[in-house]
């Protein structure tokens, strides 16, 4: 569909040709993705897309990026020196943590970079690497403008914790990397979005704004002045269900902390997932949980570390906790993904249909302005003027459109398409069926 794989596949096509992040699908007009989110991190994927310019490349890249986090995780485990028997269990737990898989269910998103970069930054800090700490901080900030929250939460943790000791000289680098850099970067990002883009997505905090109010400062004011309301807004059924789904896979270990400073790592969970009014923020089927759950994973790891080193629990008990976490995680992961196999089988049994559909869509001239059904937009990503019939021009007629391409069944109201009325407008205004049409695909030409 257009959101999000249609948007990002069209964006990568433009990046492949002129290095811009311009899309027409994201806001129904030609607009750089930088006008919506500051995400230069995407350019790290571009070389691979240039070699293999397929939509599948983006999905494969996302999976590889997310699970590449196992590399810094191995280094962290070696550094904190957990009992050797626990190392393979911790690694196995990471692989079956539901969010690491389910968050990719709606294809590529820049947030996929959060797990490896958060863990690389954590490892750089406990290793007291100066230059690489700055590097991984910048890379983390380049994911998205709100990534500064993850950096600040790490900064607050390392400022008040007593688990790791740092040289006095390194502390200056720590404060520079984890406080000065993210605050300055966020301020710059907000300025650029306000001046040249769509502005910050404050609408996702509408539940924290009074009538007539707008802006992040108003959100902060209301949070400070109305803490009980904010606290109450967290205890909705869906949010509590979300909390269960992100904590239960770790046997609630993130909550078992002797060091209160560790709870700073939960800051993004509240600011990015629970406080927002956008329902997908607290749904593990979407990409907004990558960063928060990576920090929860670190909290679980730190919990095991303190329980082991302070001899508050025997190694056998901790091994049992990790084993149970793997079982819980695997069960939740299976419940969310077992039907994915059906979709693969569905494609394989109808491969001729999908191959024919792809051939039909590729035959549409690239220089035409195309209005398409959302499911067709990834295949039409090479078109510079590509729009989704579901929301283009508020579903009104647009005379600038050259070609309309939709499933043939969309013509019939009985099939339940909300776009049927829009399609009818184009037919009534003189758009005729093209000889490019097939029995499954209806193509109208001006």
Positions of predicted regions on the chain:
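Extracytosolic helix-loop segments that constitute the early lumenal/periplasmic catalytic or substrate-binding loops
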Residues: 7-33, 40-41
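Specific aromatic-rich, kink-prone transmembrane helix
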Residues: 72-75, 93-96, 111-137, 158-161
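Short acidic/glycine- and proline-prone juxtamembrane loop motifs at membrane-interface regions
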Residues: 102-111
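Hydrophobic/aromatic-rich transmembrane helices and adjacent perimembrane loops
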Residues: 149, 263-311
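Hydrophobic, aromatic-rich transmembrane alpha-helices
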Residues: 230, 240-263, 270
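Perimembrane helix-loop-helix junctions
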Residues: 150-183
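Transmembrane-helix motifs of polytopic, lipid-linked glycan transferases
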Residues: 56, 60-81, 120-123
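Signature aromatic-anchored transmembrane alpha helix within multi-pass, membrane-resident enzymes
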Residues: 85, 176-183, 307-337
């Amino acid at each position: 569909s257009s959101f999000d794989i249609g948007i990002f596949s069209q964006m990568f096509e433009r990046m492949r040709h002129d290095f811009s992040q311009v899309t027409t699908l994201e806001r129904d007009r030609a607009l750089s993705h930088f006008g919506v989110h500051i995400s230069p991190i995407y350019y790290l994927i571009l070389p691979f897309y240039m070699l293999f310019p397929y939509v599948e490349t983006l999905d494969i890249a996302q999976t590889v990026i997310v699970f590449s986090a196992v590399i810094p995780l191995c280094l962290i485990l070696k550094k904190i020196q957990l009992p050797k028997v626990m190392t393979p269990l911790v690694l196995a737990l990471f692989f079956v943590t539901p969010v690491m898989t389910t968050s990719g269910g709606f294809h590529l998103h820049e947030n996929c970079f959060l797990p490896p970069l958060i863990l690389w930054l954590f490892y750089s800090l406990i290793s007291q690497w100066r230059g690489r700490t700055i590097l991984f901080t910048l890379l983390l900030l380049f994911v998205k403008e709100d990534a500064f929250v993850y950096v600040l939460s790490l900064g607050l943790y390392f400022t008040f914790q007593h688990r790791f000791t740092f040289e006095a000289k390194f502390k200056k680098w720590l404060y520079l990397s984890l406080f000065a850099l993210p605050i300055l970067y966020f301020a710059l990002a907000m300025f650029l979005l306000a001046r040249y883009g769509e502005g910050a997505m404050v609408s996702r905090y509408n539940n924290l704004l009074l009538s007539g109010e707008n802006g992040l400062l108003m959100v902060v004011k209301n949070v400070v002045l109305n803490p009980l309301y904010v606290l109450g807004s967290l205890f909705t059924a869906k949010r509590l269900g979300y909390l269960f789904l992100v904590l239960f896979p770790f046997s609630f270990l993130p909550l078992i902390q002797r060091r209160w400073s560790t709870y700073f790592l939960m800051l993004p969970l509240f600011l990015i997932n629970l406080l927002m009014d956008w329902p997908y923020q607290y749904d593990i089927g979407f990409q907004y949980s990558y960063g928060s759950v990576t920090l929860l994973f670190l909290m679980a790891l730190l919990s095991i570390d303190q329980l082991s080193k302070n001899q508050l629990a025997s190694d056998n008990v901790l091994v049992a906790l990790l084993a149970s976490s793997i079982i819980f995680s695997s069960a939740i992961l299976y419940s969310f993904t077992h039907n994915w196999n059906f979709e693969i089988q569905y494609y394989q049994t109808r491969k001729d249909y999908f191959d024919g559909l792809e051939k039909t869509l590729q035959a549409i001239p690239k220089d035409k302005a195309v209005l398409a059904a959302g499911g067709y937009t990834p295949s039409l990503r090479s078109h510079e003027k590509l729009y989704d019939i579901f929301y283009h021009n508020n579903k009104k007629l647009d005379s600038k459109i050259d070609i309309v391409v939709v499933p043939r069944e969309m013509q019939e109201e009985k099939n339940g398409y909300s776009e049927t009325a829009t399609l009818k407008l184009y037919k009534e205004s003189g758009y005729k069926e093209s000889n490019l049409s097939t029995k499954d695909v209806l193509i109208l030409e001006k």
